[in-house]
From Swiss-Prot:
Binding residues for Mg(2+) 1: Q291, E305
Gene name, Swiss-Prot/TrEMBL: carB
Residues the record lists as binding Mg(2+) 3: Q832, E844
Pfam assignment, any one: CPSase_L_D2
Protein name: Carbamoyl phosphate synthase large chain
Region (Oligomerization domain): 409-551
Keywords from the UniProt entry: Amino-acid biosynthesis, Arginine biosynthesis, ATP-binding, Ligase, Magnesium, Manganese, Metal-binding, Nucleotide-binding, Pyrimidine biosynthesis, Repeat
Stored CDD domains: MGS_CPS_II
ATP-grasp domain sequence ranges: 137-334, 682-873
Amino acid sequence: MPKRSDIQSVLVIGSGPIVIGQAAEFDYSGTQACRVLKAEGLRVILVNSNPATIMTDPEIADATYVEPITPEFVEKIIAKERPDALLPTLGGQTALNTAISMHDNGVLEKYGVELIGANVEAINKGEDRDLFKGVVEAVKEKIGYGESARSVICHSMDDVIAGVDTLGGYPVVVRPSFTMGGAGSGFAHDEEELRRIAGQGLTLSPTTEVLLEESILGWKEYELELMRDRNDNVVVVCSIENFDPMGVHTGDSITVAPAMTLTDREYQRLRDVGIAIIREVGVDTGGCNIQFAIDPTDGRVIVIEMNPRVSRSSALASKATGFPIAKIAAKLAVGYTLDEIPNDITEKTPASFEPTLDYVVVKAPRFAFEKFPSADSSLTTTMKSVGEAMAIGRNFTEALQKALRSLEKKGSQFAFTGPVGDKAELLAEAVRPTDGRINTVMQAIRAGATQEEVFDATKIDPWFVDQLFLIKEIADELASAERLDAGLIAEAKRHGFSDAQIGGIRGLREDVVREVRHALGIRPVYKTVDTCAAEFAAKTPYFYSSYDEESEVAPRTKPAVIILGSGPNRIGQGIEFDYSCVHASFALSDAGYETVMVNCNPETVSTDYDTSDRLYFEPLTLEDVLEIVHAESLAGPIAGVIVQLGGQTPLGLSQALKDNGVPVVGTSPEAIHAAEDRGAFGRVLAEAGLPAPKHGTATTFAEAKAIADEIGYPVLVRPSYVLGGRGMEIVYDETRLASYISESTEISPTRPVLVDRFLDDAIEIDVDALYDGTELYLGGVMEHIEEAGIHSGDSACALPPITLGGFDIKRLRASTEGIAKGVGVLGLINIQFALSGDILYVLEANPRASRTVPFTSKATAVPLAKAAARISLGATIAELRAEGLLPRTGDGGTLPLDAPISVKEAVMPWSRFRDIHGRGVDTVLGPEMRSTGEVMGIDSVFGTAYAKSQAGAYGPLPTAGRAFISVANRDKRSMIFPARELVAHGFELMATSGTAEVLKRNGINATVVRKQSEGTGPNGEKTIVQHIHDGEVDLIVNTPYGTGGRLDGYEIRTAAVARSVPCLTTVQALAAAVQGIDALNHGGVGVRSLQEHAEHLTAARD
């Protein structure tokens, strides 16, 4: 059945900001789908609030709305654009929930919009836990196996407590309906835990419903990815097995494709159940993902859940098999059937052929517990990882070791040196699933644990345990051999050992091992991911390395540019860097180069097989990159390697690559050092005559104390060379300085600690610019809403700046040019300034693409990353202006007066983390970056743009109700006017005694509320935290002070997170919110597409 002719335009809903559980994989699937639909001649309308995505680029859809993904805003877009259909299955849970609520409240019917890709009945059957139970029972009646875990549905805490007895006692699993990434779920071992987990679950579920289930801890966990069309063709795209048993969320588990430990009969059984379920649920134009548990003792199969949409696993399955699930789902949604869709990779086979794999894929999660030191690091059914790396090998051991190496984290690879630990202690530690459990298991094996002991402690399948023993045996052979011969090195390489690991075991430097290996002629070959185990020829070069026989890299004539990606997402280095890499690939391809992408992150657009001419799915380590450069140099000429776009990961390789004779283009490694190294950068500033805050470098506590005494407190303390502000802190007195140095840093002459004067009350400014060696193009000037001292990645900012004048911009332009010239930048540079009093201080400069590049590009309608890639390879700004890649005149510092105002807001993952006592993690922002993603609000005035950014990040600002205010003494004066505005808008104020007193003296009424530390009053008056928990507060303003009032504030802020009440922690944010509330109350908040904004800007420029 060919494409439907009754659909001319489609609205696609994206997934919004990157949060834990819903990350870059939805940008990847959404981008693919928009392209396919556009190629089919449909008008594509997209809504997504996340500016760091490729899908929100103006060329991907016909009309792109960077607006909050809420039913109210989506309705405005539908009213304006009048699409025929709505496709909600590509934007994760956010899109699905929004679509369902718009179906339920009649908006879709009112405007005659049809849901495609999944019908409401199918979505409900898949997502509603009770209905899904019915589906599984119906399947069991038909085919005789597959069942659900025993469970009860609860709508109140009383139901929950009673439910435990029905199931036969603890432990029980709590799962809320319609949430994602396991939000609000967990294992409860006693009543206290149950009350806490179920309480949060009832709050998070949009239907206030949780399911209690019997515990299946320790069972084996599997997933199947399936697709079905309306002719009832079903394909099983991929089977995935979790290395960790049940009890760890699949997003936090190491996973393997294809499944390794299923017998053929068990696999056929899972297939039968899966196919029966997709039919019973009624998914008939798209894909779904089904999770199973198998009891290792008797083979009982339990169906855990299904997602009737494109999911995190489908991105992994697409990258693992080369079968583009999202692309095919989009085609099915507009009426095609599987047998009509050709396979892009072979061009011979249709999509109804199931992919076959002649390799093994391993995904390993990347965590960020170091950012939340108080959080409980146990892995549970709530997802906590922030990113993932994927590796491909010819066998499991090779893929596993490559995946662990790809995580780029200290201690992520297996270590076979160092003292052997105590077996009993290590086994006891391995019982609790944590981030590095696989390494603990390896240490236990080193300490003499047997396979049975490891299985009893961890319940990890004996086959996997056996593979770990095999890796350990190879390490022992390496250690005991008299000399390193060719056979031994080749064997170690086939099991995934890196040169560094071999060197560690033999007591040699990594480069020495590499020399020996090359002298013996042992190098990897590159194999193709072809979907068909080499039965048909593959047309797309998508490679992985292996120590095998023949290489499949074809010769080429065009000069190649190798772009190094950013590896697994983490806090501080996310999708924004991937965005710049993808843009570089597009721009250089247009300019006649062959583009080669190197990356190992399965969630991203950069690792899509049609983003670049060639893709290497490999770890970003020096060894792996050098081998790729070698393989490509045999294939044809290399124009250079780009390291400045992928964040800190490739930047850290630049000097070593250059030392190995690799041509690094753009900013030179020496220039990178001049900006990153404190001393060298200080000299650049001195030559340009620019002030920086007073600072010093200390290698002992005595030195640090002396510097702090001279500069004066508060001071900012941090280790040198860091991304995302790791380990920074604002220190107010000497005792805290002493504890910071003893607790948190390895301090030594080679690893000094930097002590800076902390600029209180300064305005922080971010600048993105391009420099070609002679001319500067100012990309954009962003003014931060929060004051200096909050990491720029966590602060909201506005572009164009809202309070800076023409004179300030002139100074910023001159300073930026001075620094770019002094450092020697070719391409992008990002500089952070602080304006304190009348002095413009330089805080830091990064000679690379920054995380604000996508935001700046969208806000000013100029593709900065594309321009940067061209400049790295020799183009000048003047040439790019003539070509039309940059505006003919003016730049981001001279935007027209009526340019729209864009506000970027950071999104935090607070609700995911709890400490071991189950308390939340404090939400106060500081100099260490903790956000996982961002949203953008764009409108003609600041108030509305800010209100949109808040709605996109945390849910809409309240326009009336009760506001609670409690601020530090230093903020009391500046809080009076915004507080008076809130009253004018009809808010009722509540405040703690100190704040209420100041308000009253200024003629503002506020009800006094008890602090948490004062406890409940004699007549049962509630404390503020009780008011929040009881849902009696709509807005919270709470600024932290010192360390005394810290605890009260902490209780208030964590309660706000648990109940999802907007909580502002700075007076600046309150002032912005008041402008936003004002804009909302005066109604008429409209929506405009990026294309309309861009037309307006371009017209004003000419």
